[in-house]
Structure formats: C-alpha cells, structure tokens
Amino acid sequence: MVQNLIVPYIGNRKVQELRTYDIEKFYATLAKTPCGQYVHGVKQTLTNKQKKRLLSSTSIHEVHTLLKTAFSYAVEWDLIHKIPLPREAPKANSEERTIWDEKTMLAALQTIENPALHLAVHMSMILSLREGEILGLQPSDLDFDAADGRGTISVSKTMQRANKDALEKLDPNQVYHTFPDRREGSKSSLILKKPKTKKSNRVLYMTKPMKEELLAWLEKLKQDEQNAPEKYSNCGQLFRLPDGLPIAPELLTKWYRQWRSAHPEFEQIVFHGLRHSSATYQLLQSEGDFKSVQGNTGHATAAVLMDTYAHTQDKPRLN
C-alpha cells in the first residue's frame, strides 16, 4: 500500500512540508485513481475497462490509518509539531465491509462442492488468510506433527499476477519464483514472492477439520499425479490443477464468483470478505484482544487491525 498508494503521490515531499490541505488534495486524487495504477511502485498501462474501476473508499481509509501511524511517530521524534491530517478520516464504505457470522460461514462452506475452492474458503474463514497467501502455500509449509500433533501452517510467501514491465523493475530479492507462462505473448506472469509485510510471516495452528481436509487434499494431489504421470507437471504448490500446474488467483476468484452466483441465499461478499469475517469472529471470541488476533491475521500493526474492526466490539453490547 505504501509503495503503490502513497509514495507515487507524496513520496517526494518532506514530512515537515505537508499540510492538511495537501493531504485532503491527496485523498481527492486517490478517489479518482484506478485500482492497480501502480504495482510495486511502477505505473501500469491500463485498459479503458480497468480505468473505470476506481480505488474504494475503504482503501483510502486504510491509507489514512497508515499515515496517522507514521505522522504519530514523526511527532514523537520531534520531526513535526502536529499531525497534518484532516479532522475527519475518509469514511469506509460499509458495503465493502460486509461480513458473515460463524453460522453463515459454516452453512456456506457446506454448499461448496469444488474441493480446491472448499479448502481455500475454509482456510480464509478459519485462518484469516489472504487469497495470495493461500495460493502461495507449499506442502513443505505444513507440519502435521507440530504443536503436539495439532499441526501448523507456516505463511511466508504469496502468489500474485504481475505485469511483466513491473516485474522487470521489481527487486529480484522479493521474488522466489516466476512460473512459466501458459500462453505465448502473455503480458503478465504468475509469481511467488515475499508477503505483504514482515508481520505477514506467521505460523498458524490447524483445527481438526482443517487438518483432515489438508490430508485428504494431499492424497488427491498424489492420486492426480499417479493417474497421468506423463502429463503431470508438478509446480510445487499446495493448490494445483489436476495436471499439476498452479491455481492462479484469477481462477480461484472465478470459481468463487460462480459459487456465489449460484447461492444468492447468502449475503454477497467478495473473497477478501471471508478474511474480514474471520478476523471479526476472532475479535469477538477473544473479547477484543487485538494484539493476539493481529498475530493470526498478519496485519502490519495492531492499530491497523483496531481501526478496521473496532466496530465489532459493539456487537456484544447490542445483544
């Protein structure tokens, strides 16, 4: 977020020079900015269709939260005398924060027949994993004997699709692997890279149902390879197609949207909303232990988590 939504616009300004007017003007610019305008700090060439999809108010609200944290440190270090942010933060769109309660999550999960989608949704709901983190997992990240047999999952990589012009300018130390293109002339590549932030590196505990599903999935992968060894190309990822190639983020999104369209009985949320639902449920169960939940979700700071999910603390008082 810093690299793509802050640095390109105000990154060349000295912190002492920034005034409230500058920040308000910056927010106004972001409100007119297409999603994906910058990737890894590199400006992208967008299609007319892509240009119409603007940044959400929630993204701008998250930028405000990051700036608030940064400026607070600047005040503490005597670099500035006061925080130059507007009194009122940009309001996040409540529709973008639609979440499911635990009963809805369980009911929805029981309707998913696609085994790969079922596992991905299960992991997002239970472990608060991002889509790229799920697809970035490898079998070696699973330890079924750890934690006295409970089992753990190590999160240290993320998968994403990147335009090749952006990939050329990306620090090679950030990229673990670039997958071969499935089509000639492709303008983008599927990559395995370091996660969003250092806090995103974390070890999570399996639940019993999660452990059972993971073991069954690994058995399926083994069976797929045995069924057609001459056509199988093991990409090394946990989430693979029957031919061994990686499941790309756009394919997982397609499957999720198809399932969502087939089940209008559930309140419509995007895939990332499953992570929000999970984090909200964890906060309610832990009675607002933001620091503990941050360790599970991988948010950069507890402050970011708190700002995003503080509304969940009203639920127990309203019941």
What are these regions (language model features)?
Residues N4-L5, R13-Y21, K25, C35-R87, ...:
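N-terminal DNA-binding recognition helix of tyrosine site-specific recombinases/integrases
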Residues K25-F26, E76-L109, P242-D243:
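Flexible interdomain linker/hinge and immediately adjacent N-terminus
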Residues Y21, Y38-N48, K91-L117, I126-L129, ...:
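Long, amphipathic, Lys/Arg-enriched alpha-helical "connector/arm" segment
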Residues T104, L137-E219:
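Conserved tyrosine-mediated DNA breakage-rejoining catalytic core shared by Y-recombinases
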Residues K91-A92, I99, R150, M159, ...:
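Catalytic-site neighborhood detector that most strongly recognizes the C-terminal catalytic loop/helix
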Residues Q16, Q44-N48, D181-L252:
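Major-groove DNA-contacting interfaces characterized by cationic-aromatic clusters
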Residues C35-V39, Q110, N114-P115, L127, ...:
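Short, basic (Lys/Arg/His-rich) helix/loop patches that form interaction surfaces
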Residues T65-S72, H118-L135, T152-I153, T280-Y281:
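Short pre-functional
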